[in-house]
Amino acid sequence: MCDGKPVSPLTLCRILEYTREKDSTRTKDRCLGMKPYIIGIAGGSGSGKSTFAGRLKEAFPESISLISCDNYYLRHDDIPLAERALLNYDAPEALEFSLMVQQLEQLKNGQPVLCPVYDFTLHNRSDKVIEILPRPIILIDGILIFHDPALRNCMDLKIYVETDADERILRRARRDMVERGRDLDSVIHQYLTTVKPMHNTYVNPTKVFADIILNGGKNEQAFQLVKAQIQQILDSHK
């Protein structure tokens, strides 16, 4: 554990070495059965966690399956669009943790799963699904993935990305306006009424469960160290 503080590269090396030693027997057993090694990447909205996870996926495209927690928001077919836009999407109650756990267990058992797809322009799940394959490494990223004990217990390595609040809100505003068709006023209103208070209440406290806390999602030294850890896990499959 990191006691809620960002770690230096040297400390990060020691943590990775500790994690490697702690999980060596379990990892070997899983490799024999080709069961995936599951890495959770959490952090506040706009922290850079998805960017970090995406870079890892790009580094090992055939060996990593990436799951976004955002796709597991609950359905709200019975609520009008205007009202759905005002719902609190940053509280644990907004997510279907049980489905996440169920599908991770299926992946660990070598079974592909059909992951739901959330449509942020409609504030609801779409009718589409994404097939996720049981590759050697499963990455799951999301703001609240360390909140649920059952989901947390599915993970072999937990990483929390900590980023300055000003930087997070700027990233979120840019993303929501460009990718999700939002206007600036709605982004600011949502941030002040739900995103910020829920981050302080639910998201930030979960960093105590992290094995590693990174200072920013663009931390190149940390990326290279985690990448090396993944490479070692993959080598043990050979």
Task: Write out the residue ranges for each language-model feature.
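Hydrophobic positions on the alpha1 helix immediately C-terminal to the Walker A/P-loop
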Residues: 52
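Short beta-strand-centered segment that lines the nucleotide-binding/catalytic pocket of NTP-utilizing
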Residues: 62-77
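NTP-dependent small-molecule kinase module
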Residues: 133-134, 196-238
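Conserved nucleotide-sensing/catalytic segment adjacent to the nucleotide-binding pocket
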Residues: 79-120
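Short, positively charged and aromatic/hydrophobic N-terminal segments
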Residues: 11, 15-18, 24, 30
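P-loop (Walker A) phosphate-binding loop of NTP-binding proteins
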Residues: 44
